[in-house]
A protein has these predicted regions:
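Functionally constrained cores in energy, signaling, and assembly domains
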Residues: 28-29, 105, 123
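N-terminal export/targeting and maturation segments
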Residues: 2-80
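C-terminal partner/receptor-binding element of secreted or periplasmic proteins
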Residues: 120-151
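Generic alpha-helical propensity signal that fires on short helical segments
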Residues: 19, 84-89, 122, 128
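Compositionally biased, low-complexity repeat tracts
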Residues: 13-14, 82, 116, 139
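Mature extracytoplasmic domains of secretory-pathway proteins
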Residues: 52-119
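A residue-level detector for conformationally permissive "hinge/kink" positions
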Residues: 9-12, 100, 135
Length: 151
């Protein structure tokens, strides 16, 4: 009986150790998750600006601290985003529906990122990656074409 209990205990210890090792090896501590609420707000505001003929101010939708935005064309490889940022891009997006917008702090670190989930597209910006200052992140939407507002 004692041998059986020792064998069961050893098997359980190995199982728990194996699970802990699997979790440790597959963890992704540095991944930056997409801000779903911000993505939905931006997508809704694009549709509203198109319908109402109003401007879309990204700074008003994202009122927290950030200084620049990168507008990333769909299908842009992570390696290209990493080159532009100057460090590895670890953004996690379950599925890509449109352009990614990466909000950067003054030091170049990522504040947050969102993805545009509507039927429109960005126009009048550099591809595959455009950079705009916060003050320039005001857009006109016409026929679901999102373009920076002329200053």
């Amino acid at each position: 009986m004692t041998r059986a209990l020792i064998a069961v205990g050893a098997a359980l210890a190995l199982l728990v150790g194996g699970l802990a090792l699997a979790v440790f090896l597959t963890r992704d501590e540095d991944g930056i998750q997409v801000d779903n609420l911000l993505s939905e707000d931006f997508t809704r505001e694009v549709a509203s600006a198109d319908t109402n003929g109003t401007d879309l101010d990204l700074g008003a939708i994202a009122p927290f601290e950030w200084s620049r935005v990168l507008v990333i064309q769909p299908g842009t490889p992570d390696a290209e985003i990493s080159r532009r940022l100057g460090y590895e891009w670890t953004g996690v997006l379950g599925f890509e529906t449109g352009e990614k917008l990466i909000l950067l702090n003054r030091d170049g670190s990522v504040s947050r990122f969102l993805d545009y989930r509507g039927n429109g597209r960005f126009g009048g910006v550099e591809t595959p990656i455009a950079e705009l200052a916060r003050d320039d992140a005001v857009f006109r939407v016409d026929g679901l074409v999102i373009t920076p507002k002329e200053r």
